[in-house]
A protein has these predicted regions:
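Re-entrant/interfacial helical elements at transmembrane boundaries that shape
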Residues: 82-85, 117-129, 157-167, 330-331, ...
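Membrane-interfacial loop-to-helix junctions in multi-pass transporters
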Residues: 1-4, 55-61, 87-101, 132-140, ...
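Hydrophobic mid-bilayer segments of alpha-helices in multi-pass membrane transport proteins
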Residues: 3-14, 21-41, 61-67, 251-262, ...
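Hydrophobic alpha-helical transmembrane segments of multi-pass integral membrane proteins
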Residues: 65-66, 93-125, 338-377, 381-382, ...
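Transmembrane alpha-helix interface/packing and boundary motifs in multi-pass membrane proteins
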Residues: 14-21, 71, 105-114, 145-151, ...
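Long, contiguous bundles of hydrophobic transmembrane helices that form the permeation core
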Residues: 4, 176, 180-297, 450-453
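Membrane-core helix-loop-helix motifs of multi-pass transport proteins
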Residues: 128-217, 385, 395, 408-445, ...
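Core transmembrane alpha-helical segments of multi-pass membrane transporters/permeases
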Residues: 26, 49-81, 107, 273-274, ...
Length: 453
């Protein structure tokens, strides 16, 4: 009975999310409560399960809250402006350098963990160069989304937070060993960017370089391009407001603070939530000492904070009921009778490979909260640690961002003036290649076993 209810809960959750009948936030709260009642769980017992799940995920929620606020303050203060400007100056009129610079810029901006911010800043900064050089904007969307897919594996990014939340593991234990894999993934994106840039240079030919764009050579839809260009230009008031937030005199201080934060994270100086709380407090007081300024900066980023943190606490209800009711144990026992014994020791590698199609066809919420906990219970019986399964589940993220279920990808293609289908066809093979590169690196560094035992 528990097995049927457990699978029914997961399938109902995934179906409603995929059909967009309800928001993930509502689904994570309402669906497990409904199925818990059907299982005969209620009253104080149900409340204790939910509270235990929320209590378990509270540190992750706190960490995400202050990480988003911290990096929001750093972007507001202009910490990354010199690097952005240096990239734009150095690429010149060489398509190979332009595409390479696009990848570097996207990887840098992706540190804040928000895809929409990455796409807006990257496209707004570098799209005019693509227009002037008549370059194919598909190169821009390809390397931008791949860089974002790799860099979004930070603890304050969505996928890792979901994996750690679903499996009740420490985000730092998942992330720190992933750093070399992320470095290799970014290196792969940079190599790809240079290859695409050289190919674009050959396509254009030397004669085309530095020539102002003609209407005939403008993007596929010149009307759309005109709208996009206009959309990329902020209003004067907005530009002045953004400039007033910059703190160029504190740039070195902010850089040192960020480096210290990352070092503290890697060496485990303090728990992640505490590190980000302390770093945020120092950053906002140093950059915006006046109380009205501090309130304004917090309010400016409150939308992102609420959207992410509310989802984490709602996931606490889901995982608390799934675990506390015994559903996940019953489901894993059932799967043990189905999964061939020879497969069980390789479930981490299988999960890493399967994360590419799974997260393409279903949302991250459905995969991490619905599928991963069940598979992890089976893997645990084969001697694979949940932390290893969490790392394995992240490998497919560059492919996930090409899914039509990812709203921010529509923003990217819209800003760049390309068709979504063209972007998918152009990028998919490269995304799979980056995922496989990260898989090989993860196995080489021992992040999860090729075969346990």
């Amino acid at each position: 009975m528990l097995t049927l209810l457990g699978f029914g809960m997961v399938i109902t959750f995934m179906t409603l999310i995929m059909l967009k009948r309800v928001s993930p936030l509502v689904a994570l709260i309402a669906i497990p409560i409904l199925f818990a009642v059907l299982a005969g769980v209620g009253g104080d017992e149900l409340g204790k399960m939910m509270l235990e799940g929320i209590r378990t995920l509270a540190p992750t929620g706190v960490m995400l809250m202050f990480a988003i606020l911290y990096f929001g303050i750093m972007i507001d203060a202009g910490l990354f402006d010199p690097v952005v400007n240096r990239i734009l100056r150095s690429v010149g009129n060489d398509p190979a350098k332009v595409v390479f610079g696009t990848a570097v810029l996207a990887a840098l901006v992706s540190l804040d963990g928000d895809g929409s911010t990455t796409y807006m800043i990257t496209v707004a900064s570098i799209l005019p160069l693509y227009r002037r050089l008549r370059m194919d904007a598909l190169n821009l969307t390809c390397v931008t989304i791949l860089a974002s897919g790799v860099m979004n594996l930070t603890p304050w990014g969505g996928p890792l937070a979901r994996a750690a939340t679903a499996l009740h593991v420490d985000p730092a234990e998942v992330f720190v060993p992933m750093i070399p894999v992320m470095v290799i993934g970014v290196a792969g994106v940079l190599v790809l960017a240079y290859v695409l840039g050289v190919r674009e240079r050959r396509r254009l030919g030397k004669a085309a370089l530095g020539v102002p764009p003609l209407a005939a050579d403008a993007p596929r839809d010149s009307h759309q391009a005109q709208e996009v260009d206009t959309a990329l230009l902020p209003a004067n008031g907005e530009s002045e407001a953004a400039a007033s937030l910059r703190r160029p005199r504190l740039r070195w201080f902010n850089a040192a603070l960020t480096v210290a934060l990352i070092v503290g994270l890697v060496v485990g100086l303090l728990p992640l939530p505490v590190l980000f709380m302390v770093a945020f407090a120092i950053a906002i007081v140093a950059n915006y000492p006046q109380l009205p300024e501090q309130r304004a900066r917090i309010a400016a980023h409150a939308g992102n904070v609420i959207a992410v943190v509310a989802l984490i606490f709602a996931a606490g209800v889901f995982t608390g009921i799934l675990t506390g009711s015994g559903m996940v144990k019953s489901m894993s026992d059932s799967l043990l009778t189905i999964v061939p014994p020879s497969w069980a020791p390789s479930l981490a590698t299988i999960t890493a490979i399967a994360s590419m199609p799974f997260t393409f066809f279903v949302s991250n919420d459905a995969f991490y909260y619905g599928v991963l906990p069940i598979v992890t219970e089976v893997a645990r019986n084969a001697g694979i640690d949940p932390v290893e399964m969490a790392r394995a589940s992240l490998i497919g993220q560059p492919v996930h961002l090409l899914s039509p279920l990812v709203a921010s990808t529509y923003l990217l293609v819209g800003l760049a003036g390309v068709e979504f289908g063209d972007h998918q066809r152009f990028t998919l093979a490269w995304a799979i290649g980056i995922c496989l590169l990260m898989l090989v690196a993860a196995l080489a560094f021992g992040l999860f076993p090729l075969s346990a035992g």
